[in-house]
Amino acid sequence: MPFSKAWRSAVYPDFREQGAYINYKATKDILHRMKEDIANPSTPDELYNSLLLQKCRVYKWCEKKIKELLTVAEALMAASDYLTEEDTKTNLSLVLNTLGSGNMKCLPPNEARLLADSITHELLRFVECCNLNTDTIEHIIGRMYRYAVLGPTGKHWNNIMTEYDYHKLSIHEIFYLLSKVYDRVTATENMRIVKRSGIPAGTVGSQVFDRRSVKYWVHLQDLPFVIARIIPHLPHSTFKETYQTCKERNIPFTLGSPVSSVYWDNNEFLLYHRRLERLEGATLIRMRWYGDPLENDWNKLGPNDSVFMEIKVHHEAWSGERSNKRRFALKEKEVNSYVHGELDLNPALEKLRAKKASKKELHNFMDLSTEIVTKIDAYDLKPVIRTQCSRAAFQRGIDQSIRVSIDTDLRVCAEDFGLGHHWRYSGVDAPVSYFPYAVVEIKLQCAENERIAPWIEELMSCRYMESVPKFSKYAHGIASLYGHTPFIKMVPYWMHQLDIDIRASTKPEQNQWDPTVGLASGCWERTTDRAIFGVGHAQTQTVGASEAQFLPRTDYTRVYQKALHGIRGEGVATPATADNFQDAEAEGGCASGTAGSRKQQLQPRLPAHTLQYDVDRRHKAYTTFHLYPFAEYGVESLCFTPASGKNAAAEVLSGLIPWQTGKRIRVPQKYDPKTLLTSERYMLKWTEHATRLGLVGLGVIQFGNSMTLPGDVTQLSSFWRANFHIVLGIALVLVALMTLMYALMTFKARSRRVYARKKIRFDDSWGPTVLTVFLAFGICVIAMMHILGRYGPMLTGDDNF
């Protein structure tokens, strides 16, 4: 079975020895007995009990592993107080052994980063272990539909995924501590750079900035891998530090904070349709507030809490204006009066004047407040939906150049359309729709023609994130809750693709685009292309991909094990036996000196399996065996071959474009008219030449005369003398038809490539080559015939040559 082989390749041997996996082999034996005795009702119960017992064991192991990771992360966080800016050479083994002893006096930034990377590596291995267990259970349940009469029936089977749910165990606290450590390390390294160069980091002159935002879907299984790529570069950002409060109150800590928004529209959903059609001036109005992370009730809002009145206006590129978002804050008790046009804004103006706001700021405030309430009255807007999510933001201080936000637990609930004469619905029985994925938004602010950071390029192109441009929580909520009503004329393009599996483990490897290769697949074509385009760095590699290094290949597992032994005191408390001294000498330590120095220099005993394992071991196993372990329609797990499956190669000549490599959500694109017009002109050029050639062929057929043929042709048979002009004309017409077909097929292929927005060459790599070869061959043949006809008898001495 492909899954059985992939499972054996995907497990981590050290975790397997600790009992961290569902025993697929033992479970498969029960499935085989179920297949042999399909009518036995006790076999499904035996399988359920076996799975539940194994999940209980795995759950306990996960709890223990999380506590272990948290202990190491807390020790590193405490040691980061002693980060030094000096280039001090230290013994890494000594640092690891004293990590949890409280004797840390000096910690270089590079070693602190190495320790943080090793903890991150171990944490991602733990996540992969949990994900493989989930895939195993899904695969087993999928096979039960074949082997059992009625499949997994009974109420207890409905709870098999929720019983001992190890995915509910939070790892947010570990990520928070690692984020703080990375932030301190980066700050220390920047201070070291400032001391060396004397130029403050980030000092730039006046620049013109380009702002853009890209949204992605991330499966919850893959979310830790995305966070692990962010925290080494951007720290966790929050308005209110809740970590210590959660520790004191014994409350589970989460990275996110509640964000709630109430969107306003009319009964015909005018703003929704205009927004979905991307019309010039499309407007969106909402009221947003930020909840307390320590509160379980996200709807809780006090009378004096701030509520932001926001308006977003879309502008097309041809308008010369940029889409913008503007907002101002009011107290919750003032919102009802404001939306009904009864609120006196003079006190708010006086507060702004007291804060020494400029006249322009006062003018903008009055314009914005008047614009929102005017649109509410003009379009008869009412509260229609409410979106709520837990948002985790990653940003370095007040630097707006790079900001990443992650929205989880996204839910959309219906409002009462103003029937309660309140700006939001205060009941508890509203219909709710839950979004299955996390939403990652990357906001960039960079100067014109400035290259973005390599790690951002790597993050945006990694297989863990699925790009969904123009994704809108408001549009999704309207389509989810009211899409069945006659008032909704259209829905977003992603609504029918929510059931597509976007897990990274089901995606093939993404090969980096090489612009020197293009459509060429052979060695000769590659050599020719590189001779033309060159072999420079910018031509041969994707820009930024070669520099974006995440967790370079280091023995992180061994570093983590050493740190863990040092925290537990096992490295110091190891008995000073002869074997230990030999181990210390093998590690490069010294067995001489005082007893205290010996204890510090001794290496802790490590298991024999401290080998380096990739964090994407499961994905590599699935890719090797072409296995995609997810069940469609709840029936069977599917396998796709790379030749004929969903990721088959493009048939460029016929113009068929398959799924983009590593991409599952199909996105409609706007096409540049100039590109299509250029392609049409290219086709018309070929059509023009084909038409001329075809007319010449038709003229030869109609008006040709064999009497005007050369003398060597008149010596042929009577048939050829009478029909030679017809044969010649037909040949010309066939060449013209082939040229027309080539022009049409090339135009279609290029158009589809433009539609798909694939990173491949748009020029024709075969047509000019074939045409040049045929012309060169024809010229050579004609030249050789003339040379042989004129100089052949002289060179050979034969008059009959």
Curated annotation (Swiss-Prot):
Domains as described in the record: The SPX domain has very high affinity for inositol polyphosphates. SPX domains may integrate inositol pyrophosphates (PP-InsP)-dependent signaling to adapt cytosolic phosphate concentrations to different metabolic situations.
Residues that bind ATP: K215, R286, R288, K312, K325, R391
Alphabetic keyword roster: ATP-binding, Manganese, Membrane, Metal-binding, Nucleotide-binding, Transferase, Transmembrane, Transmembrane helix
Single GO cellular component term: acidocalcisome membrane
Protein role: Component of a polyphosphate synthase complex that utilizes ATP to synthesize and translocate polyphosphate to acidocalcisomes in epimastigotes, insect-stages of Trypanosoma brucei. Catalytic subunit of the vacuolar transporter chaperone (VTC) complex. The VTC complex acts as a vacuolar polyphosphate polymerase that catalyzes the synthesis of inorganic polyphosphate (polyP) via transfer of phosphate from ATP to a growing polyP chain, releasing ADP.
One GO BP: polyphosphate biosynthetic process
Residue sites binding Mn(2+) per the record: E441
Activation and inhibition: Activity of the enzyme is Mn(2+)-dependent and enhanced in the presence of pyrophosphate (PPi).
UniProt keyword Manganese, yes or no: yes
Required cofactor names: Mn(2+)
Protein's UniProt name: Vacuolar transporter chaperone complex subunit 4
Transmembrane segments: 693-713, 724-744, 769-789
Residue numbers on the Cytoplasmic membrane side: 1-692, 745-768
Pfam families cross-referenced by the UniProt entry: DUF202, VTC
EC number: 2.7.4.1
Family the UniProt entry places it in: Belongs to the VTC4 family.
Gene3D superfamilies hit by this protein: VTC, catalytic tunnel domain
Residues on Vacuolar side: 714-723, 790-801
Root EC class: transferase
GO MF term set: ATP binding; metal ion binding; transferase activity
Disruption phenotype: Results in growth defects in procyclic forms (PCF) and changes in acidocalcisome morphology and number. The mean number of acidocalcisomes drops by approximately 2-fold, but individual acidocalcisomes are considerably larger and less circular. Also affects cellular polyP and PPi content. Short chain polyP drops almost 2-fold, while PPi nearly doubles.
The keyword NADP belongs to this UniProt entry's keyword annotation: no
Reaction(s) catalysed by this chain's protein: [phosphate](n) + ATP = [phosphate](n+1) + ADP
Subcellular location: Acidocalcisome membrane
Principal location class: membrane
Record text on subunit structure and interactions: The VTC core complex is an integral membrane heterooligomer composed of at least the catalytic subunit vtc4 and the accessory subunits vtc1 and vtc2. vtc1 is a small membrane protein without hydrophilic domain. Vtc2 and vtc4 are related and have 2 hydrophilic domains that face the cytosol, an N-terminal SPX domain and the central core domain. The central core in vtc4 is the catalytic domain.
